[in-house]
Regions:
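Helix-loop-helix hairpins and the membrane-proximal interhelical loops
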Residues: 1-52, 63-76
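Membrane-embedded alpha-helical modules
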Residues: 131-217
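Alpha-helical transmembrane segments and their membrane-interface exit regions
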Residues: 54-57, 80-87, 176-181, 202-203, ...
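Alpha-helical transmembrane segments of multipass membrane proteins
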Residues: 29-34, 60-61, 120, 153, ...
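Entry/N-cap segments of selected transmembrane alpha helices
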Residues: 14-25, 78, 141-145, 200-205
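Structural signature of hydrophobic alpha-helical transmembrane segments
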Residues: 20-22, 41-51, 76-81, 109, ...
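Helix-loop-helix junctions within the multi-pass membrane cores of secondary transporters/permeases
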Residues: 6, 76-164
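Membrane-interface helix caps of multi-pass small-molecule transporters
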Residues: 50, 63, 91, 95, ...
Length: 232
């Protein structure tokens, strides 16, 4: 079973000063309004966030729906966008693994992988006994997931009062927050180098391939930072 003490400790961590709760909520208010505007009802909007729970994936799903893409194409588009979460999963799960914990917890908790929850866990895992980290992580994930769902409902109900510019402003709050958090995480050579090179190479590749510039810049920046760190 899930240890309630560590679960609620993780759940309450979303109230911290560095919590992404406000930024995450603002972005999903925009998602809720967008889903209503493209024809979703309230139940469908909630179910969408319940399953997708990632801002880029939700945006891609909505955009694909608008242009009339088939269900399989929407599924593939969201799957490809959310593939970016795989490296985060690979880097996080070894920190949570403990032989006393059942495997179903780890399979369940993979759904909570998102930049918001991942940043909270990476900042706090050392203060939690390894045996209980998975319960702490499930608490974090449940908290951020709940915020996303509640914000989607608020956005859906407030859609008539939000114009296009307001929705864009709300949607961009979360990426800005993550950018600030990444700068704050520059505590090692590898992390600092990857962020700085990414900020330089991303725009540089835009002139070569606008569609793939972020991917190319990120892969190259991360690879260089990794090998520089290994050489050190």
């Amino acid at each position: 079973m899930i240890n309630s003490k560590y679960f609620f400790k993780g759940f309450k961590s979303i109230k911290g000063i560095n919590s992404p709760a406000l930024a995450l909520g603002a972005s999903f208010i925009a998602i809720g309004a967008l889903l209503k505007n493209i024809g979703f009802n309230l139940e469908q909007s909630i179910f969408s966030t319940f399953l997708t729970y990632a801002l880029p994936g939700s945006l891609v799903m909505a955009e694909s729906f608008i242009v009339g893409a088939s269900l399989i194409n929407i599924f593939l588009a969201v799957w490809l966008v959310n593939a970016r979460l795989y490296p985060m999963t690979v880097s996080l799960m070894p920190l949570l693994l403990h032989k006393s914990q059942p495997r179903w917890k780890y399979y369940l908790s993979c759904h909570f992988i998102a930049v918001s929850a991942w940043l909270i866990m990476k900042s706090n895992y050392q203060s939690i006994e390894k045996k209980h980290r998975i319960d702490f992580w499930i608490g974090i994930g449940t908290g951020t997931w709940s915020i996303a769902i509640i914000a989607t409902v608020i956005g859906f109900l407030a859609a008539d009062y939000l114009n296009k510019d307001m929705m864009i402003g709300l949607a961009i709050v979360n990426p800005v927050y993550f950018g600030c958090m990444m700068v704050g995480a520059m505590k090692s050579l590898q992390i600092s180098l990857s962020i700085i090179l990414g900020a330089i190479l991303g725009p540089a590749f835009f002139f070569i391939s606008p569609e793939w510039s972020i991917l190319y810049g990120g892969v190259l920046a991360g690879t260089i930072a990794y090998f520089v760190g290994e050489l050190k």
